[in-house]
Amino acid sequence: MSQQRGIQNTENRGSKNKGEKLRTILDDSTKTIYGMNTSKYMSKDNFLLGDTAFITLDSSLTNIEKVSPDEKNQFTYQSLGNIGTPINNIFNYYPSTFSISSGINSLNYYYLVSSEAKFYDTKSPYIDLSLFFGGNGRSMVDFVFSRNINKNWNIGFDIHRISADKQISASKAKGDKNINSSLFKLFVYHKSEDEKLTLYSDFVSFRHQILGNGGVDVDSDSLPLNFFTYNDFSTRLKDIENLERRKRLNLFLNYKIIEGLEIYNDFYFKTQQVEYMDENYVENAPYYNDFFLSNISTLDSIKIKSVVNRAGVRGLLGDIKYNFYANYKNLNYLYTDNLNANIFNEIYLGGIINFSRKEFDILADFKLKTTGDYSLLGKLKSKVFEISYYSGLHVPTLFQSSYSGNHFQWDNEYNSSFINTLEAKVKINTNSIMLSPFIRLSSIKDYIYLSNEKNPTQHDEILINNQFGVNLNLNLFNKIINLESRYSYNTVSKSSADIFNIPKHHIYSRLFYNGKWFNNSIPVQFGVNAYLRSEYYGNAYEPSLQAYYVQNNFLLERNLRLNLFYAMQVKNLRVFLKMTHFSQFDKFDGYFVTPYYPAQKKVLDLGIKWYFFN
């Protein structure tokens, strides 16, 4: 009996083991592995250009240490020395949009980059989490969630946060806020079963608060400063606040009629509200020249609403992608002291034609308004060279035409600005060297800018700005040692000398080690980012207008900035450490990035980027 029980138990255990093995085989064979290759996205802009390929998630360590807009753009932007502060493109003075706009755009970067429309196809639930913990009370959070309900529907949301303490004249060691910014986006994407209908919709809410101080109180005649005391600096203003709110509702529909012929409609409803508040009249009054509405306190605001609808036809004829459309925009705005809103209506026709072959790519993009204003862009691209030409007549922005606040008021009738730009570059590639000389020749007539008096001015002469430079990339020892660099030399015409204030020399370099440690399982990068520019009279910032203006008194000294970094990756987790402004060897040393606003002093920063699947 005992033998039989033993045999029976053995048989039972054998059956059990066989069952477990069978289950394991079934589990391993049926289990789907979700990861980098199963979660993809496509931008709506690329979709409209006919590029319908989904993009795999970025898992590279390259440039992961760059957080602020000026760092990400090789310091071709200026800011107020802190993350989340208003920014200005140093080298590009031309309107970024053809359609009439508010013109209050110093915070555009934080809104546009985070609210970009993307079509996600993630298969499984997907999370993209980015955390930045900067020294001196600076932090950023980017959270993206997306999941496929089924193979045809995807939903998700984004949350983006920026928080930063004051870096100069802080009233306490921690928590004296300079920046509070948040953006929330809810989106849905649908592709029908027969792949004829594409639907995308999103809702975006953006709030950006700046608790400013007008910069440090120094006389331009006392420059350069020998000591940067940061928290002990006196400031030009106290307890002022800028607050900008934006909302956006977008509904996009695309329908394929037949192969090569599709129709679409893209609808937007947008709001923008900008406020400037200063209730500290006693201390701040000497800063202002005029008081038009109140000599006790300032509460300026502008409210803008716009409805935009674009209807078009797009498709593919052989090697030619085409997109022809009509664009309608209704815009109304209201200032603090206005009882009735001002209304604008705008209509223009546009088209994009792209002829693509393996050897080269030709693109033509044109827009024409009923007023005669136009935009024309042509590009020719091959493996060896690229050349582009742009010509356009751009109407003044609302801000340039009309403004009503407590400290500034104007009502202008300006001509459209006439812009011409020619760009070209050559690419020379070998196994270890990429050399790419480039040139940009630009001219603009009837240029509109904020003058030193902080009022719009239109210059009727032709202004010329030319840029010559070279991009150089090197990789040595089987791509273990790498160098990425860019140098530009900038010139302006005599008529532009006090209007286009740009550094004559500008250099960016990234020298880094790239390899794998711990039995080739952990990718690692470490190195230095270097930025060098020559001295120039950089544009200054006016808080009450939330805008940059031309000035010719405050000289920004030549400076070299070095950021040391170390980055590593463990599966879906990437981490970096960065010593920002490592080249500040003396704690009282420093420089100005914008008149009256010092650069970030030396701090240690930590960043994390983590993907989660299923």
Annotated model-derived regions:
Residues M1-K66:
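Sec-dependent signal peptide cleavage junction
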Residues S29, D51-T52, S59, S101, ...:
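Coil residues (strongly favoring Ser/Thr
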Residues N88-S102, A117-F133, I263, Y322:
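Transmembrane beta-strand segments of Gram-negative outer membrane beta-barrel proteins
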Residues T122-S124, E244-N280, I296-N614:
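Exposed, low-structure sequence patches enriched in small/polar residues
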Residues A164, S171, K177, Y189, ...:
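Flexible loop and strand-edge segments within Gram-negative outer membrane beta-barrel domains
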